[in-house]
Amino acid sequence: MPIQVLPPQLANQIAAGEVVERPASVVKELVENSLDAGATRIDIDIERGGAKLIRIRDNGCGIKKDELALALARHATSKIASLDDLEAIISLGFRGEALASISSVSRLTLTSRTAEQQEAWQAYAEGRDMNVTVKPAAHPVGTTLEVLDLFYNTPARRKFLRTEKTEFNHIDEIIRRIALARFDVTINLSHNGKIVRQYRAVPEGGQKERRLGAICGTAFLEQALAIEWQHGDLTLRGWVADPNHTTPALAEIQYCYVNGRMMRDRLINHAIRQACEDKLGADQQPAFVLYLEIDPHQVDVNVHPAKHEVRFHQSRLVHDFIYQGVLSVLQQQLETPLPLDDEPQPAPRSIPENRVAAGRNHFAEPAAREPVAPRYTPAPASGSRPAAPWPNAQPGYQKQQGEVYRQLLQTPAPMQKPKAPEPQEPALAANSQSFGRVLTIVHSDCALLERDGNISLLSLPVAERWLRQAQLTPGEAPVCAQPLLIPLRLKVSAEEKSALEKAQSALAELGIDFQSDAQHVTIRAVPLPLRQQNLQILIPELIGYLAKQSVFEPGNIAQWIARNLMSEHAQWSMAQAITLLADVERLCPQLVKTPPGGLLQSVDLHPAIKALKDE
């Protein structure tokens, strides 16, 4: 067979073998493109695990009409232009292969509009030569990509797709990782027309632990130790779980990011494992969410087809830096607070050297004793060091250069050009509000909040009651019923049986399913908030309440149930309060604007401050 140039579609399908492994790979590439475009909101719609439809819609800068055809061509990108750019990459994408590869194994449609254009344009590629057709369309500022029938023309690849549930779980995990990398972006994920995940953007200076708790769970949040460690141009931030309380479930939480890019790096994992090895068993793994910031010149991201790995120019330096950062926080957690007396304090001690890794350790100089590292709330430089010259750094690198690179992907300020509200925006407009930052827990069941410089107290049991009521109140569809493993059979009177039969349709909307006979009623299913309740007490009380009613409204019944549910928390922790408020703000946004009585009480500190100043 003679040497010949492959047709464009065949060449793209070969490239797709590396880029498009499964539907989750498509979602990752397209969402990263949205982030590179400066999007602050991304909506992801999935059907049948991504095999039928993947739709990514963002409010980024958009693509000009003249560049739409280029966007679907191979090796066409706006991220880099020269070899110098390739050596200092800060964007998530840079190869220009994703859209061309995806369009070769699916029916891809690209619709986009920039702020300068009066109308949007739509592009799609088809045929053996992948010719691009562009036509006008209706679309707000931003971009929408639709990927239909993935692998429709490559049956062998489609045959290797797993079940719908498995493929969607992979997509869900990718979105979790991206949501942990970009707290400033709102991300909504739906599957088969149903909203599955809603990650609201965290405002600058806001409490990132809310999204952390929503993704990693309350158990991780309760054991999380905040890290903020710096040396020269290396910065390590994030959270590591207390190794003394790490469980197998927590050990699955291992998220690492390098300059905002999600990674699976053995060097970083090894450094963290070494720092925790004295407190972990042989079969245990550490749990962490860590963000490493490094000069883009000192890391090569173009070493893996799917960009899952990186290569550090100074790998030993990075390893020891991470090791000392994690070890310092773990050691501070074990230290007791300093006594407030005049007794002489012990001399500062040196942090133990990393003897396992070869080479000189640049971070083991003596360090002064510092306060205990806080849980879940980042503190100013809990284990930081003064900026020092970067050992063995490449000559000629300037710190200002790194700042310029970091600023290239900053989201444009919203004041530069106001955008017209999109049709779907009003539904989430109320979610832009927040109760504020949780400062501490007072009297075991009240949260002390700070918002815009104002202090307030919030009753956690009342907030929990409103959340339960929102979870029980049916919307457009009835509340999902959870079948009971062992149905509950109760004896009822004729009056109670009559009331139950009249309220049957209302109870069905609330997710309560029952069957009655002559003198008994059998409860077969209840909604999720009732699963952990003592149903042998709650259900008879509910039946007694219904027997006294003449009108059976689902909303009134949901309100009664919410008021009579037993709280799962006798004493609230910070992590539980943060998780609760995140759920309340998502499901009950109206409570933020107009808090009902008994929920929120402002605290006036001015008299106390005035009294202190007058002393």
From Swiss-Prot:
PROSITE patterns, per the entry:
DNA_MISMATCH_REPAIR_1
Presence of the UniProt keyword Cell cycle in the record: no
Entry protein name: DNA mismatch repair protein MutL
Its Gene Ontology cellular component terms are: mismatch repair complex
Where does the source fall among the domains of life? Bacteria
Kindly give the HAMAP family that the UniProt entry links to this protein: DNA_mis_repair
**What's the family?**
Belongs to the DNA mismatch repair MutL/HexB family.
Q: Which Gene3D superfamilies match?
A: 3.30.230.10, Histidine kinase-like ATPase, C-terminal domain, MutL, C-terminal domain, dimerisation subdomain, MutL, C-terminal domain, regulatory subdomain
Q: Where is this region: Disordered?
A: 363-397
Keyword terms: DNA damage, DNA repair
GO biological process: any one? mismatch repair
| Protein's gene | mutL
Please report the organism this UniProt entry assigns to the protein: Escherichia coli O139:H28 (strain E24377A / ETEC)
Give the protein's biological function: This protein is involved in the repair of mismatches in DNA. It is required for dam-dependent methyl-directed DNA mismatch repair. May act as a 'molecular matchmaker', a protein that promotes the formation of a stable complex between two or more DNA-binding proteins in an ATP-dependent manner without itself being part of a final effector complex.
UniProt biased composition (Low complexity): 364-391
Q: Does the keyword Cell division apply?
A: no
InterPro entries tied to this protein:
DNA_mismatch_repair_CS, DNA_mismatch_repair_MutL, DNA_mismatch_S5_2-like, HATPase_C_sf, MutL/Mlh/PMS, MutL/Mlh/Pms-like, MutL_C, MutL_C_dimsub
**Single Gene Ontology MF annotation:** ATP hydrolysis activity
